[in-house]
Amino acid sequence: MADKLTYTLYDVYYVKYYIIQTKPMTVKHFISKPIAIVSAMHGELSQLLALMPDEHKQTRAGREFWVGHLHGHEVILVLSGIGKVAAATTATLLIEHFHASQIVFTGVAGGLGKNVNVGDLVVADSFLQHDLDVSPLFPKYQVPSYGVSTFQADTQLATELQQVCTQVLRDLPHVLGHQAMTAFGLKQPKLHLGLLISGDRFVSTTAECQKLQQDLPQALAVEMESAAFAQVCHDYNVPFAAVRTISDRADDDATVDFNRFLSQVASHYSASIVDKWLSKRKAS
């Protein structure tokens, strides 16, 4: 027994310091692979934190990472910060430091598509940076050295999110309550699948909105982070998907109180989607 215990401690010591062992194992066998859930603002993540009974906080690079469990899954919740640079830093930390096995972004966005309205949900199948332009060296929107302008969402994750979003919209009176639905005029919100675009500016004028609609007619919604996450996840071969709640039409006609919408609608959407999604997944 003493020899066996000594051998085990010996192995652990070597794993800790990343030295090759005599047993056929690698460091990754001893490293957990949590699921990361990300939002840009605290209001989008607040309801999720309430669902995790055992969360504890770790701070890295000025960010608070909340580690815990939900439906048997190890989960990390984090605010990415607003904008593509902040998003890229957060994505890299999740992968390099926390060894995230997959990343899902939940939050709000401005609607661009013709029939994309306030209260609708958009599950992205692809991502593009609408403010990336290195022409004439490369075609507009193309990411230098990659030869592409869009990065794809993980098909399996996107499909799972679609299924859950359909259920959430069907149960909306229970998720939000009739009072919130009435207050924000949410009658029959729809689910959309398609292109999500990101850029380092808050699109809030009709002129900007129309320009994006003209240049990128296939875009369903616009925000400021997901395309950066998609590129980093592509680099590391980590599955990524995003679901966005439409908070406005990204133009001059926005009449919704954003903070109220965030607390009474978007945060409940995010919590319900993630809760139902993880409850359906088999815990590893």
Question: Where is each model-derived feature located?
Answer:
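A C-terminal functional module that forms or caps the active site or interfaces directly
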Residues: 199-251
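Glycine-rich phosphate-binding loop signature in dinucleotide/nucleotide-binding domains
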Residues: 96-99, 236-238
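His/Asp/Glu-rich mid-to-C-terminal helical/loop segments that flank catalytic regions of hydrolases
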Residues: 250-284
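N-terminal short beta-loop-beta anion/metal-coordinating cradle
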Residues: 26-92, 98
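Mid-sequence, gly/pro-rich, charge-dense loop/helix-turn segments that line enzyme active sites
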Residues: 113-216
